[in-house]
């Protein structure tokens, strides 16, 4: 006589991640790698080049475990298609929707805070986040890197010319 024991494991709660001043996504990367706990994601970045990098990384993470789709990614990375052409292919409609909701090329402060919050919620909901079910949210981000920003370099060159620059 065998007895079957069924253990119900509660589903682990997932936390949406809002990455402000995302840059190319370095801080976000660790959270993305733990997608069993964290997700969906909204990365907010004002620099369009950094947003392109975020999109390429998002494509990589979405396709890396799919053998069929992995060949699409390899084709894309091999420069046989550009990012827009790749995402505009009908077979990538779902992928494009995720990318469009995950990455927001936007300067924080350009809209009032209520409009910004509404847009972020919309993007999270479009990816399956449900505030009413108690889905959590984590906000990550850091200040813009002044040492490498265009404004920071310009300001430093002016300080050097005027003798005000002190690197220590």
Specify the residue positions occupied by each region the protein language model found:
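Conserved active-site and SAM-binding loop architecture
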Residues: 1-168
């Amino acid at each position: 006589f065998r007895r079957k024991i069924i253990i119900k494991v509660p589903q682990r709660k997932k936390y949406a991640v809002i990455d402000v001043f995302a840059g190319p996504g370095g801080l976000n990367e660790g959270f993305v790698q733990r997608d069993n706990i964290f997700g969906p994601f909204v990365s907010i970045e004002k620099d369009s080049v950094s947003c392109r990098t975020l999109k390429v990384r998002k494509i990589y993470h979405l396709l890396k475990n799919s053998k069929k789709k992995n060949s699409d990614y390899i084709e894309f990375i091999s420069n046989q298609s550009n990012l827009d052409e790749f995402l505009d292919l009908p077979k990538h409609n779902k992928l494009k929707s995720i990318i469009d909701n995950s990455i927001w090329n936007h300067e924080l402060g350009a809209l009032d805070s209520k409009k910004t919050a509404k847009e972020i919620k919309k993007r999270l909901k479009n990816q399956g986040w449900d505030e009413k079910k108690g889905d959590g949210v984590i906000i990550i981000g850091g200040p813009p890197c002044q040492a490498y920003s265009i404004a920071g370099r310009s300001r430093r060159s002016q300080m050097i010319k005027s003798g005000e620059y002190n690197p220590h």
